[in-house]
């Protein structure tokens, strides 16, 4: 059995992002790029399954749509434990385009399980995984919080209101995973980092796919209001702040 994990290259959540050209373009200057956290959890679970001899997983591959400057993120996935990687050589523009490129690459190799994070931490679209499944004609399970393999059969657990749902899914299939699929992402050890330098990254030229959406503008969030400490025995100051600063009350004298 072979597993492929789709990964995204996203800004670290601690990075202060900036926009240019009247908020129509993302400025990558100084940005620290990382594996999308949801995809990292998917990779962790895939590696756990590979290490479980009873699961019968022979290899774990990661696939990514991006240009050459995204390869450090791919190398991190290899350092964590992936056996090899595929990079589709195209700048990701929208979910449809990314899913189409991933599906085309997957068609060329016989993978049994395709895993995707439920969303990316930058755009939060939650659509790539289901689109990949549709392009491939594979069954898919969304919001998967558990995945085991018993006697060659995949068993997936989903969190639902009031309990859990357990499904048996025939291979090949797409699992769109969320929190719970793994306890925490793995940290690359020094040995893994050294080995990642020589692990193969297969570069594939993209197929012709037109994005279905167009980015119009970014809108940064409003700055957070300042925090003002007020003594509990000073109700007059509290009223003044609520009236003049927060502007949530109106006081008549």
Regions found by a protein language model. Give the residues of each.
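N-terminal glycine-rich FAD/FM-binding segment characteristic of electron-transfer flavoproteins
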Residues: 1-253
């Amino acid at each position: 059995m072979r597993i492929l994990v789709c990964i995204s290259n996203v800004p670290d959540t601690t990075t202060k992002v900036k926009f240019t050209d009247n908020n129509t373009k993302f400025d990558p200057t100084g940005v620290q790029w990382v594996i999308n956290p949801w995809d990292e959890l998917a990779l962790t679970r895939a590696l756990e399954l590979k290490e479980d001899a009873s699961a019968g997983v022979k290899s774990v591959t990661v696939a990514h749509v991006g240009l050459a400057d995204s390869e450090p993120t791919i190398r991190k996935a290899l350092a964590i434990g992936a056996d090899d990687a595929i990079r589709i050589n195209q700048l990701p523009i929208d979910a449809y385009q990314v899913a189409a490129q991933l599906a085309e690459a997957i068609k060329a190799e016989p993978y049994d399980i395709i895993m995707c994070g439920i969303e990316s931490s930058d755009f939060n679209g939650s659509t790539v995984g289901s689109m990949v499944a549709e392009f491939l004609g594979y069954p898919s399970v969304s919001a998967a919080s558990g995945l085991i393999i018993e006697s060659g059969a995949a068993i997936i657990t989903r969190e639902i209101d009031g309990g859990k749902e357990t499904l048996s899914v025939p291979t090949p299939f797409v699992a769109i995973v969320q929190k719970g699929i793994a306890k925490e992402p793995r940290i690359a050890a020094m040995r893994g980092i050294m080995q990642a330098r020589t692990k193969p990254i297969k570069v594939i030229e993209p197929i012709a796919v037109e994005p279905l959406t167009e980015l119009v503008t970014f809108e940064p969030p409003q700055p957070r209001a300042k925090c003002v400490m007020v003594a509990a025995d000073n109700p007059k100051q509290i009223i003044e702040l609520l009236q003049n600063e927060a502007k949530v009350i109106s006081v008549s004298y």
